[in-house]
Amino acid sequence: MMQPSIKPADEGSAGDIIARIGSLTRMLRDSLRELGLDQAIAEAAEAIPDARDRLDYVVQMTAQAAERALNSVEASQPHQDAMEKEAKALTQRWDEWFDNPIELSDARELVTDTRQFLRDVPGHTSFTNAQLLDIMMAQDFQDLTGQVIKRMMDVIQEIERQLLMVLLENIPEQSARPKRENESLLNGPQVDTSKAGVVASQDQVDDLLDSLGF
């Protein structure tokens, strides 16, 4: 491939500096095109905004689910508090009646209040059950966000793979041995760490970058 010559820039010449940067940029683009990596890098770059949008979606869905759950809890709390308060009051009145039996008229009032409380309980519990169901339904975001997060991880791994490919295809001669040792990176990490020479994928990446001086 014919590469454009890069002329030394005069120290004070902005035009020469711009020309040099332009030549370097053109040389890089031509090299990527010759290696067949220009499209892969472009696809990886396009995936970054998509991943950001997906992450925003996960945040929004999580926030909506949290808000629904909190609203349901806040709506249920008064019903639970009312039942608790009334139950304690009735229990105290019945305990006092057993300790010191009261007049028939007072006893009738106690029975009437107790019956009213029992009639009100199903309404409170029905409302609370509906709120609990809404809390449970709010958790369905996990299925959707789980799929989105998995897709984002695939995108991140693909970007890393493409960047590693560029490095491995363009490292200098003195780095040939580290290149051979790290060629397995392009096939993804090996899970069986019990095998000799196998390390975690991130460690492999770090070793490669260290060997290249990054």
Swiss-Prot record:
It is found in: Cytoplasm. Disulfide bonds: none annotated. Disruption phenotype: Cells lacking this gene display a strong clockwise motor bias; in combination with a yhjH disruption and overexpression of ycgR, cells switch from clockwise to a counterclockwise bias. Changing residue 110 to P: Loss of function. Residues 184-193 have a biased composition (Polar residues). GO terms for biological process: archaeal or bacterial-type flagellum-dependent cell motility; chemotaxis; regulation of chemotaxis. The keyword Cytoplasm applies. Changing residue 145 to M: Loss of function. InterPro entries: Chemotax_Pase_CheZ, CheZ_family_phosphatases. Its EC number is 3.1.3.-. Residues 176-199 are annotated as: Disordered. Keywords: Chemotaxis, Cytoplasm, Flagellar rotation, Hydrolase, Protein phosphatase. The record marks 147 as: Enhances dephosphorylation of CheY-P. One of its GO terms (molecular function) is phosphoprotein phosphatase activity. GO terms for cellular component: bacterial-type flagellum; cytoplasm. It comes from the Bacteria. The keyword Metal-binding does not apply. Homodimer. Interacts (via C-terminus) with phosphorylated CheY (CheY-P). NCBIfam families: PRK11166.1. Plays an important role in bacterial chemotaxis signal transduction pathway by accelerating the dephosphorylation of phosphorylated CheY (CheY-P). Acts on free CheY-P. Belongs to the CheZ family. This is Protein phosphatase CheZ. It comes from Salmonella typhimurium (strain LT2 / SGSC1412 / ATCC 700720). The lineage of its organism: Bacteria, Pseudomonadati, Pseudomonadota, Gammaproteobacteria, Enterobacterales. The gene is cheZ.
